[in-house]
From Swiss-Prot:
This is Solute carrier family 35 member G5. It comes from the Eukaryota. The chain crosses the membrane at residues 37-57, 67-87, 105-125, 160-180, 190-210, 221-241, 250-270, 281-301, 305-325. The lineage of its organism: Eukaryota, Metazoa, Chordata, Craniata, Vertebrata. The keyword rRNA processing does not apply. Residues 1-21 are annotated as: Disordered. Belongs to the SLC35G solute transporter family. Residues 49-174, 272-325 form the EamA domain. Keywords: Membrane, Repeat, Transmembrane, Transmembrane helix. GO terms for cellular component: membrane.
Length: 338
C-alpha cells in the first residue's frame, strides 16, 4: 500500500502538474495563530490593558469624593446585570444549568471577592503596587493549582517567562514592603497588601473553577452571576461596614462609569482567554496591567515611581514577550490529499 501514499507517488511526465499557488497564498492557507496564541493576545489587549486603568480610576474616585470600596463594587456589578437580556432572548437559564449551578455561583463569588479585595487595597496602597501583588499571587497560585489539580504542565520557555514576570513583580513591590511606615498607617498599608494577595488567590481559584464549567452560555452566565452575587453581598455590607457616599462632582461619576465599562470588557476577555490557554500564562500576560497602572500612577495621579518600578516593569514586559513569542505557533489547516 506504500505506492498509494502521496509521498511515494512519482510525478507523471505525461500529465502536466497544476500551477502552484503563490507563496503568500500557501502561507495563509497553511498557517494561522493557534488557540493559545489567540487567547493570550485577547488577554493582553482586552484583559490587561483595560484593567490597568481600573485601579488608578478607582483611586481617583476615592480621592475626589471618598467613595467607599463596596459602593464602587456595587456600581461595577450594575454593569453586569444587563447581560440578563441576551440570556433571556436566547432562552438560556440566568443561573446556568441546574446540575452545575452551584459551581457557577461559587465562581461568581470568587470573582466578587477578588474584585472587592482589589478595590479595598487600591485605597491604601499605590495602584501599581496593588496590581503587582494581586497579579503576582494569581500567577503563582494558578501555576500551582493547575499543575496539581489538572496535571497541565508548562514548557521551558513558558516557565522562563512566568518566573521572569514574577521576578519583575518582586522588584516592583519589594522596596515598598521593606519601608512600611510604623504606626496605624503602616498597619493599613500592610493590610492593603494582604488584601491584594487574597484578591489574587481568589482570582486564580475563580479561573480554575471557570475552566471546569462546560455549557454554551458559560461566559455570559458567570458574568451575570458575578453582578448578582456582588450586589447581594455588597449592598448590606455597605450599610453595615461603610458609609454610603453620593458623589456630587462629574469626575467621580466619570471614573465610576469608566471603571464599570473597562472592568466588564476585561472580565469578558479574560473569561475567553482562560479557555484557550494555560491559566498561569493568562495571568502572566495580564501583568501588562501593572505597567499601565504604573504609567497612570506617575502621569495622572502624580505619585512617585521608583527606579525599581521601572526596572521591574521592563522585566515584566520582556517576560510577556517571551511567553507570547513562544506561543506564536502555526497550525496546519490544510490536509494532505490521499
Amino acid at each position: 500500500m506504500a505506492g498509494s501514499h502521496p509521498y511515494f507517488n512519482l510525478p507523471d511526465s505525461t500529465h502536466p502538474s497544476p500551477p502552484s499557488a503563490p507563496p503568500s497564498l500557501r502561507w495563509c492557507q497553511r498557517c494561522q495563530p493557534s488557540d493559545a496564541t489567540n487567547g493570550l493576545l485577547v488577554a493582553l489587549l482586552g484583559g490587561g490593558l483595560p484593567a490597568g486603568f481600573v485601579g488608578p480610576l478607582s483611586r481617583m474616585a476615592y480621592q475626589a469624593s471618598n467613595l467607599p470600596s463596596l459602593e464602587l463594587l456595587i456600581c461595577r456589578c450594575l454593569f453586569h446585570l444587563p447581560i440578563a437580556l441576551p440570556l433571556k432572548l436566547h432562552g438560556d437559564p440566568l443561573l446556568g444549568p441546574p446540575d452545575i449551578r452551584g459551581r457557577a455561583c461559587f465562581c461568581a463569588l470568587l470573582n466578587v471577592l477578588s474584585i472587592g479585595c482589589a478595590y479595598s487595597a487600591v485605597q491604601v496602597v499605590p495602584a501599581g503596587n496593588a496590581a503587582t501583588v494581586r497579579k503576582g499571587s494569581s500567577t503563582v497560585c494558578s501555576a500551582i493549582l493547575t499543575l496539581c489539580l489538572e496535571s497541565q504542565g508548562l514548557s521551558g520557555y513558558d516557565w522562563c517567562g512566568l518566573l521572569g514576570s514574577i521576578l519583575g513583580l518582586i522588584i516592583i513591590v519589594g522596596p515598598g514592603l521593606w519601608t512600611l511606615q510604623e504606626g496605624t498607617m503602616g498597619v493599613y498599608t500592610a493590610l492593603g497588601y494582604v488584601q491584594a494577595f487574597l484578591g489574587g488567590l481568589a482570582l486564580s481559584l475563580g479561573l480554575l473553577v471557570y475552566r471546569s464549567l462546560h455549557f454554551p452560555s458559560c461566559l455570559p452566565t458567570v458574568a451575570f452571576l458575578s453582578g448578582l452575587v456582588g450586589l447581594l453581598g455588597s449592598v448590606p455590607g455597605l450599610f453595615v461596614l461603610q458609609t454610603p457616599v453620593l458623589p456630587s462632582d462629574l469626575l467621580s461619576w466619570s471614573c465610576v462609569g469608566a471603571v464599570g465599562i473597562l472592568a466588564l470588557v476585561s472580565f469578558t476577555c479574560v473569561g475567553y482567554a482562560v479557555t484557550k490557554a494555560h491559566p498561569a500564562l493568562v495571568c502572566a500576560v495580564l501583568h501588562s496591567e501593572v505597567v499601565v497602572a504604573l504609567i497612570l500612577q506617575y502621569y495622572v495621579l502624580h505619585e512617585t515611581v521608583a527606579p525599581s518600578d521601572i526596572m521591574g516593569a521592563g522585566i515584566v514586559l520582556g517576560s510577556i514577550a517571551i511567553i507570547t513569542a513562544r506561543n506564536l505557533s502555526c497550525e496546519r489547516t490544510g490536509k494532505v490529499e490521499e
